[in-house]
């Protein structure tokens, strides 16, 4: 026999109606609801923990206080009541990760809110440094300008401004192509040679070098020049009509080419009419169009608003900038019957009897863009100057205008122009990047030797009729293009891309339009009579660019 104790098989209960023992009486164990996300801070209720001052409910259950731990007084004292007259302060429940979203903004706030306490005022309560609950970022004494914009740092997530299209898209127009700016920025057409002159027209006056000495202590009032500038489109130019019969297959003006070549810098909507006749393409502008107006602060963070009747609206500023540019380009010349003029081979094609025309010289130039694409464009100069070696140098004269530095939040010219001209120019490059790029492209296309920029400001920010010249500055167009990061190879590539798209289409009329609210170029197929009404209105009320009586 073995010395081991005998093994007795235990009795196992079998529950036919459920799981678990069936003969053991119920012990009335209370059920306590629980949540797996609750923080375990105690193992039993024998002792009470010292609560934290900031988060007294840190270890509380998600389901609140359970009745099994509550103390009930057996005696009934229904006739005795205690009235609490002190106001109760609501405490927010503790939640893990509640302030994790603001950790990025509070990384470097040690010492700003007082004794290194993280800034949580934006979520309620007061900061340790004594700041009020409206403080959001820097604690002490800092209040937000608008309580509805809390969390929109640096203007992010701000509502975008809806711009109007330059032309209303009709239902019978057919969309052919949509090209976004990132695709256009990747284009390049290198090794485009200098344009070849095939015709020169008009006459130029000499630039007055006395305006190079103008500064803040010797400013000059801007005069109103009663001279006329004809802004003739491509198909109405008699010289282009004559040249199109024997040479070239793409025809345009320098304003139209610069608009297309600098389209990736534009924010406002614009459009160019394209007419395809066989193998020839004409790039035109619409009649009764705002195409010739200069934009103001187009690329700034806060461009001008469209306010009816305001002198600082976008349209009023565009009219003001256009007239300033016209007056400045004619005032800085040596005007007079006895003054010398530079004459081109042919007279001004837009000359009219009894009309004092502005000093403009037209150069019709030709470029070979490859793939049997020959471009002919009308370019222009504003003045001529005699170089150090006695040769004639052609100038493109433009004017930048200041209207209200406080509204635009830019550099004040009357304080910085003489001492920090680079800062002034950098501010203009930021606010008017598209306009300066267009001027540079026009000067490069025309073959100008110098690009003369004038700084013109209002005598009073509230007076848009009187201006003063504060200074001038000159650049070489090719060097200035490099300074403003203008890639001419990319500009030629954008132009060639749009020309190739039109060349693939059948004969007809098309429209190239910049989308008003998206960085995108759209190509539409439009009917032949799409803009005939605009042309009739233009012929009824057509006036060349000059100064009106109220300007």
From Swiss-Prot:
GO MF term set: mRNA cap binding; translation initiation factor activity
**Superkingdom in the source lineage:** Eukaryota
Location comes to: Cytoplasm
Q: Which Pfam families match?
A: eIF-3_zeta
Keyword set, alphabetical order? Cytoplasm, Initiation factor, Protein biosynthesis, RNA-binding
Q: Does the keyword Protein biosynthesis apply?
A: yes
Stretches the record annotates as Disordered: 108-152, 527-551
Query: Locations of Low complexity compositional bias?
Result: 115-136
Q: Which GO terms describe its biological process?
A: cap-dependent translational initiation; formation of cytoplasmic translation initiation complex; regulation of translational initiation
- A GO CC annotation given for this chain: eukaryotic 43S preinitiation complex
Q: List every stretch annotated RNA gate.
A: 290-304
Which HAMAP family does the annotation name?
eIF3d
Family label: Belongs to the eIF-3 subunit D family.
Known partners and oligomeric status: Component of the eukaryotic translation initiation factor 3 (eIF-3) complex. The eIF-3 complex interacts with pix.
Q: What is known of its domains?
A: The RNA gate region regulates mRNA cap recognition to prevent promiscuous mRNA-binding before assembly of eif3d into the full eukaryotic translation initiation factor 3 (eIF-3) complex.
Which function does this protein serve? Answer: mRNA cap-binding component of the eukaryotic translation initiation factor 3 (eIF-3) complex, which is involved in protein synthesis of a specialized repertoire of mRNAs and, together with other initiation factors, stimulates binding of mRNA and methionyl-tRNAi to the 40S ribosome. The eIF-3 complex specifically targets and initiates translation of a subset of mRNAs involved in cell proliferation. In the eIF-3 complex, eif3d specifically recognizes and binds the 7-methylguanosine cap of a subset of mRNAs.
What is the name of this protein?
A: Eukaryotic translation initiation factor 3 subunit D-2
Q: Give the species.
A: Drosophila simulans (Fruit fly)
Q: What is the lineage of its organism?
A: Eukaryota, Metazoa, Ecdysozoa, Arthropoda, Hexapoda
Q: Which gene encodes it?
A: eIF3d2
